[in-house]
């Protein structure tokens, strides 16, 4: 009896971990003119209020995580600069 309860609780715990995954929201923009590219952030630490630094075709922006996959977190790195990006 106790092993069945333990198995059910373990299954519920694993299920809640899987369901609680968070992602950057999918961008509705598929392309952007280079002159409109801007980075508001390069890493999550640049964002406030629990938002993440997410990559879009028009640059990196702070977005609140969602439970739907499809978006992409900004890679950051030394070459990332905030502000308008000029090529």
UniProtKB/Swiss-Prot annotation:
Entry protein name: U15-lycotoxin-Ls1h
Coiled coil: none
Disulfide topology: 24-54, 32-58, 41-53, 42-80, 47-62
Organism for this UniProt entry: Lycosa singoriensis (Wolf spider)
Function description: Has antibacterial activity.
Main location: secreted
Post-translational modifications reported in the UniProt record: Contains 5 disulfide bonds.
Entry's Gene Ontology molecular function annotations: toxin activity
Keywords tagged on the record: Antibiotic, Antimicrobial, Disulfide bond, Secreted, Signal, Toxin
Domain WAP: start-end pairs: 21-66
Leader sequence residues: 1-20
InterPro entries from the UniProt entry: Elafin-like_sf (IPR036645)
